[in-house]
């Protein structure tokens, strides 16, 4: 949500930065009177829709298959996918876009795909080129340079600060392990990251699980969550 100041008043109101599927459907219904408008999303996911004229408003991942394919696929709110605080945000955005775009008719049959986004961004370029391999190679090169998976192996240790510190203090990590953090986690907890070369992944995992076992044996009060190669780092 984005803050909006009301003219002439000192109060602030919040408005949604991303228009929901239902609101979008209502607006398009008024713009195209007489055209059937269907929604597919959190409340109800449609598996398919009949051919013929109509509008389908779907949230990412809930796009129904249209009989004969869609005449046009419009990808909106691209920034909402691309700006997520997630190492795989670009990868996930491209996956969802390509899945939605694949539901359009072939270009030779009049099918069109339009993405509302900055065309210079790598995921958008990959979509325009229809080249996920190019994007994957680029991502791998960047992650290798920055020291992120899959170029290295990582583990996250999440819990209250004292419990995380206790587990790491008791872990006999490989000598070349790097401990990064802390970074904020959900519900007031924190997360530390352990990074090792790919060849040392087994040693890292064994050390962390042994330390977790020691805490469990002495019935430590605060739990700690361990994840090797977590999907979310930050």
Regions found by a protein language model. Give the residues of each.
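Cys/His-rich short segments
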Residues: 1-30
């Amino acid at each position: 949500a984005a803050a909006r100041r009301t003219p002439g008043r000192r109060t602030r109101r919040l408005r949604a930065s991303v228009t929901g599927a239902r609101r979008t459907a209502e607006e398009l219904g008024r713009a195209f009177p007489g055209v059937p408008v269907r929604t597919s999303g959190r409340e109800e996911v449609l598996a398919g829709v009949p051919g013929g004229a109509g509008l389908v408003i779907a949230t990412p991942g809930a796009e129904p298959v249209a009989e004969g394919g869609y005449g046009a696929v419009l990808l909106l709110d691209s920034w909402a996918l691309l700006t997520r605080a997630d190492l795989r945000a670009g990868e996930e955005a491209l996956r969802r876009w390509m899945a939605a775009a694949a539901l359009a008719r072939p270009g030779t049959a009049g099918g069109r795909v339009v993405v509302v986004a900055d065309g210079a961004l790598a995921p958008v370029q990959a979509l325009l080129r229809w080249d996920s391999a190019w994007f994957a190679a680029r991502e791998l090169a960047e992650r290798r340079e920055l020291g992120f998976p899959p170029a290295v192996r990582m583990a996250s240790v999440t819990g209250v600060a004292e419990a995380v510190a206790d587990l790491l203090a008791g872990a006999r990590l490989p000598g070349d392990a790097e401990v990064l953090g802390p970074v904020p986690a959900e519900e007031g907890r924190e997360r530390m990251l352990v990074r090792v070369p790919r060849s040392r992944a087994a040693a890292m995992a064994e050390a962390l699980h042994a330390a977790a076992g020691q805490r469990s044996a002495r019935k430590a009060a605060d739990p700690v969550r361990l994840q090797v190669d977590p999907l979310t780092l930050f």
